[in-house]
Swiss-Prot record:
Its main location: periplasm. GO terms for biological process: transmembrane transport. Pfam families: DctP. It is found in: Periplasm. Disulfide bonds: none annotated. Residues 1-24 form the signal peptide. This is Uncharacterized protein HI_0052. Belongs to the bacterial solute-binding protein 7 family. InterPro entries: DctP_fam, TRAP_DctP, TRAP_DctP_sf.
Amino acid sequence: MKSIKGLGKLLLASSILFSSSAFAKTIIKLGHYNSDIHPSHIALQEYFKKTIENETNHKYEIRLYPNNQLGGEDQIVNGLRNGTIEAGITGLLLQNVDPIFGVWEWPYLFKDNQEAKKVLESPIANKIGQKMEKYGIKLLAYGMNGFRVISSNKKLEKFDDFKGLRLRVPLNSLFVDWAKAMNINPQSMPLSEVFTALEQKVIDGQENPYMLIKDSGLYEVQKYIIQSNHIFSPGLLQISLKTWNKIPKEDQIIFEKAAKLYQEKEWELAIKTELEVKDYLAKHGNEIIVPSEAFKNDMVNASKVLYDSFYKKYDWAKDVVQKINEAK
């Protein structure tokens, strides 16, 4: 009798254990560098997260960590590669292990947001994205950080005005080489130091997308914004391949659907927000200068030396750029 009772207790305990594990949620931590009011975070919250949670009957919980709460870009990329962080949005940091991932930020590659979006939805973008799996990352979507523009305390209306301009650029050789091609004096420093450097007139200007200029308060210590649109920066929504391979196929389909919806809505929000930010900056004392055709042509022509260098350095470069141009 005792053995029967003991067996009954064991079966009951087993059923409770099975039942609780059957309904256990899988936690997906997703970290990124943008604020919680940035279009990318809003699109994650409203479309990516909700679609996955609702359509899997809350089998997954997507936890969002904006403002570098899970670490900076390099920590996110490393976490994705080794599986300690499930998902994230970063820029093109993976170009440090394979330069092809940096191609989207080559100067003057795109003329506007619509052209960039069209190319980033094309087969060549897909093909490049798939190469990330070799490094332990699955690309889910290309988002929009936006075109980089120049803010300055000097009025820049023609190419010759660039000469000697002390411009902060990221700690990245591509940006340094671009600046030198423009006859600009590049000053590499972390973003956290830029506001003070501008305030103390250590530098004359900096370059970043409109949204970052507003969110970081840089517009407060700058007078002019030159809409140079010299480099387009995407934001990549990614998931660790280790995490991805644990997700059943039927759920992977839902993740991909959510990522596609995220991509569409994030671009819509980002383009709308960029226009609002430009209006905000103009109302807060920044003069926005749209370069003349001659000025734009001078910038594009000056960048050709960079492409000559790319073509000599990378045997894939000419073919990839050709495919990008064909996708426009």
